């Protein structure tokens, strides 16, 4: 996808980009490729592929009407090079975005990126999702949590649901639809007082299938969740 195609597709969906936003995406691409030489951020470095499979793919929650352009608090778990939250932040500057990542080198990249792109209302923290979720400054503080290809729902739900306010939503972006994954996660979702509200399917412009599972938090999460770092993965609920 050429940058011009990206701009035109957004304009067609009533999301025209300003020159500043176009420059932000361009600089994002340049820094991604530059830093990818030093640390492993992505296997995708071809410009047209980045615009399609990182930038366009990341803004799917906006294109699907799941996220409003308001000052809402969004947490991105395991964002890696900032996907999906930072492309959404460029598109919707009002979003208040927090990223937690377990690799400090990636956090360094994100801090520089935010500075270069002149993004305000972005916060980056180095550490494990399980640890921050027990901190009252993070627990039950967010309207949305996003996760793009991070873990199976059975594990992901324990890592993310505790961060949500009651009524808040987890948006899990995936490249494959696995109904059995949601069946597996049924017990975990019950224990975490949350429920699958929707399982959206759509296609990228190149016809690659994509899915967003929407999970709503119904009640406060029991204090014992999430368990200690590593446990959700080792012994899923």
Swiss-Prot record:
One annotated GO molecular function: rRNA (guanine-N7-)-methyltransferase activity
EC number: 2.1.1.-
Gene3D superfamilies: Vaccinia Virus protein VP39
Stretch list, region Disordered: 218-237
Keywords: Cytoplasm, Methyltransferase, rRNA processing, S-adenosyl-L-methionine, Transferase
GO cellular component: cytosol
Subcellular location: Cytoplasm
InterPro entries: rRNA_ssu_MeTfrase_G, SAM-dependent_MTases_sf
Annotated Pfam families: GidB
Ligand binding (S-adenosyl-L-methionine): 78, 83, 129-130, 148
Function: Specifically methylates the N7 position of a guanine in 16S rRNA.
Protein family membership: Belongs to the methyltransferase superfamily. RNA methyltransferase RsmG family.
Protein name, UniProt field: Ribosomal RNA small subunit methyltransferase G
């Amino acid at each position: 996808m050429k940058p011009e195609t990206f701009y035109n597709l957004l304009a067609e969906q009533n999301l025209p980009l300003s020159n500043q936003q176009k420059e932000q995406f361009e600089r994002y691409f340049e820094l991604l490729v530059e830093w990818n030489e030093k640390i492993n951020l992505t296997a995708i470095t071809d410009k047209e592929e980045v615009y399609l499979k990182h930038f366009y793919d990341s803004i799917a929650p906006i294109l699907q009407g799941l996220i409003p352009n308001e000052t809402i608090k969004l947490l991105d778990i395991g964002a890696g090079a900032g996907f999906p939250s930072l492309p959404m932040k460029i598109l919707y500057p009002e979003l208040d975005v927090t990223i937690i990542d377990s690799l400090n080198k990636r956090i360094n990249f994100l801090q520089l990126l935010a500075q270069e792109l002149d993004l305000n209302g972005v916060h980056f923290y180095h550490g494990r999702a399980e640890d921050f979720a027990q901190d009252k400054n993070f627990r039950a503080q967010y309207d949305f949590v996003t996760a793009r290809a991070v873990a199976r729902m059975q594990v992901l739900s324990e890592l993310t649901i505790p961060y949500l306010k009651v009524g808040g939503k987890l948006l899990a972006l995936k490249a494959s639809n696995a109904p059995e994954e949601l069946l597996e996660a049924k017990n975990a979702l019950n224990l975490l007082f949350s429920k699958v509200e929707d399982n959206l399917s759509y296609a990228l412009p190149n016809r690659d299938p994509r899915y967003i599972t929407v999970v709503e938090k119904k009640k406060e999460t029991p204090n014992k969740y999430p368990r200690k770092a590593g446990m959700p993965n080792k012994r899923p609920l």
